[in-house]
UniProtKB/Swiss-Prot annotation:
Binding-site residues for Zn(2+) 1, renumbered to this chain: H215, H295, H337
pH dependence: Optimum pH is 5.8 for dehydration of anhydrofructose and 6.8 for isomerization of ascopyrone M. Optimum pH is 6.0 for dehydration of 2-dehydro-D-glucopyranose (D-glucosone).
Organism placement in taxonomy: Eukaryota, Fungi, Dikarya, Basidiomycota, Agaricomycotina
Pfam families linked: AUDH_beta_propeller, AUDH_Cupin
Protein's organism: Phanerodontia chrysosporium (White-rot fungus)
Subunit organization: Homodimer.
UniProt-recorded name of the protein: Aldos-2-ulose dehydratase
Disulfide partners: none
Region of interest (Dehydratase domain), ranges: 1-433
Residues reported in the UniProt entry to bind Mg(2+): D101, T103, N105, F107, D109
Annotated binding of ascopyrone M 2, by residue: A627, E639, H641, W726
Amino acid sequence: MYSKVFLKPHCEPEQPAALPLFQPQLVQGGRPDGYWVEAFPFRSDSSKCPNIIGYGLGTYDMKSDIQMLVNPYATTNNQSSSWTPVPLAKLDFPVAMHYADITKNGFNDVIITDQYGSSMDDIWAYGGRVSWLENPGELRDNWTMRTIGHSPGMHRLKAGHFTRTDRVQVVAVPIVVASSDLTTPADVIIFTAPDDPRSEQLWQRDVVGTRHLVHEVAIVPAAETDGEMRFDQIILAGRDGVDCLWYDGARWQRHLVGTGLPEERGDPYWGAGSAAVGRVGDDYAGYICSAEAFHGNTVSVYTKPAGSPTGIVRAEWTRHVLDVFGPLNGKHTGSIHQVVCADIDGDGEDEFLVAMMGADPPDFQRTGVWCYKLVDRTNMKFSKTKVSSVSAGRIATANFHSQGSEVDIATISYSVPGYFESPNPSINVFLSTGILAERLDEEVMLRVVRAGSTRFKTEMEFLDVAGKKLTLVVLPPFARLDVERNVSGVKVMAGTVCWADENGKHERVPATRPFGCESMIVSADYLESGEEGAILVLYKPSSTSGRPPFRSMDELVAHNLFPAYVPDSVRAMKFPWVRCADRPWAHGRFKDLDFFNLIGFHVNFADDSAAVLAHVQLWTAGIGVSAGFHNHVEASFCEIHACIANGTGRGGMRWATVPDANFNPDSPNLEDTELIVVPDMHEHGPLWRTRPDGHPLLRMNDTIDYPWHAWLAGAGNPSPQAFDVWVAFEFPGFETFSTPPPPRVLEPGRYAIRFGDPHQTASLALQKNDATDGTPVLALLDLDGGPSPQAWNISHVPGTDMYEIAHAKTGSLVCARWPPVKNQRVAGTHSPAAMGLTSRWAVTKNTKGQITFRLPEAPDHGPLFLSVSAIRHQQEADAIPVIVQGDSIELSAWSLVPAN
């Protein structure tokens, strides 16, 4: 019945990493065609915020325009989201490209193949040129082009170090050697740069093998093999399946991973069409994903048995089909063009992305990008999530928009005349983020990830007002946020943060103690989130929006700070202060008063629940102005005010101390109220009525029970004026601290929990150590030769005076049904809120030093304590069911013994 702002039960083990959100952005629309996209770091010493190179194959009538799209996020304080095209060359039927610093001058050069022909049935007999375009070190067009070599049908290439590390090498593989010839094997070629790559000579050419219908070449750099390999490994995907080539210092070696899709009569395509290597934990080759076959419809993954050696070449691989996307067409092709591995969610294990060209007729399943995530390492099970529904012929991964570790995704529509032409070909990026912004009329919807399941920090500035830049921040568990000491402030919306200074440790949660007041200023250079992560508003100093005191509304102009990568509709918004008398809800009140409102920001979770975290809006009032007494009888939320500027230093919240019926909000008697002054950069605690354990009281209409209350600016002569400015955070109902504060009788830690006296012969246990939700919690009798007592982590729930009890091995929480039922049996679960349970326990100590665990107080129920049943467990003679019972039962005390 009562929602909470904490993101997960406090002592539940760290949640698995969830995929981030993706902010789509058009890089280039209106293209004539589309085939290749590549993330291109302009300099060789940095891969952050790379440019993008994209192009199509072109036609006989129109050469392909090779363009570098300059990343607008590569420079700080850039206000544009436009990717400026720089033409590098015009080529005939270019296919693949890669890059390397060939000249060793610190700038990456482009390596590209062209003169392919219009299709596999039209291979240029004297084509298949491999060239490099020299980077001039500045954003200049028409880069100097030099030839590396030739081989008809040249289709894929990668730069690396395959037999030596002192110069750039290129592995290049044709797909076929002649028009319509699907049977003759093509050479696998290594080109090695000469001493002077700017000379006109061709590069040294070595043939290291032959393969059939190779559609994809990938490399595993030696630097990523944890010292296992001296040189880069080459992954080939073609009719022969998926295999690995590498040079061992003496000779070339081959390891066949798998043969891929089996051959079928009448189908010219079998084997594989694309492959990529995925890291799992400490193994750089935990799995190998594959698209099958040439332009196929099958997604497969190769796995190796548990305990196998790390890497590719010392393991035996087994193929598993994950998905088949629709039937093949009459030409035996489907919609899959590429697979790519990258750590999309930041958990240290790679996901893999599947590029889907599209279908005719259009098909949601076969268009865009799918992301496969490993969810069960033991059984190598994957989940599947749609990232984009825009045609994707190729995928490039990089961090395109920040200096962090997030992985963004770039795609280009597949549009090849005479084969498959997607409508409206375009290049797009999908920027990894924890926050998405969307315009809602005059307000903004900010959708955020669950902090406990993200591995990336996200900061989004959104408003500059009253001398502060307001920034929404999502912090993963145990994450650090650098701030400006004694200047920056934080208002926590979910989770916990803490910092330390010379006075000790300071913790902030969504609400301080009821009717209290607390500073938001951080007295340290950084703060850290707790194990559940945190979502907060960071107040940073601003030189744009003035400094208090604010003498007129002209000094309180609010500035839109949304970053360039959010939708233009959000960036174009104005956030005016509106006189409250002009708001439709004023109904004639506040006439001629210096009382203004600025709306507003909805913060919701970006999952299927779409649960509300808070609504945020700003208010300002001049000297002597009352914001009007009210009690939220028509809306249910818990409101916290965070003051940016207190004009007189005397403004704050007043609330009625008499029964509601005895208070006249239109003509208030201030002697019937109490005041809490809320100074600059302070927030007040809950003003709503709560039960003793911190749950909000509800009225008959399910609204939060508030006394009459109002913000009253300090009294005085408004000449000169001095405005109060505060931010209202309107939360759904949540639990807070107990009233009055109980004594702290228990130190969080790991314990064996024994029933009654510590020498008693029964201890708290989860049946069979079973992590399944709903597993009974028992009191196990100690028997000779039996197992040791199970260990439990007892943890204080931040922002409350309650505790949780989590099984040390499984993470299951000791839970009871909510609303509570007397004599109910207690069970272990990981998701109490979703199952109508509570995991909260109040803790007291009796005169013998024994502990009692009590459920939170609830309407129509007396105290209910964690206890044991008088009836033995039916299936286990040595077990007693654990239940909740009333306070008339003597058997409700427990003893705690520290455990390892």
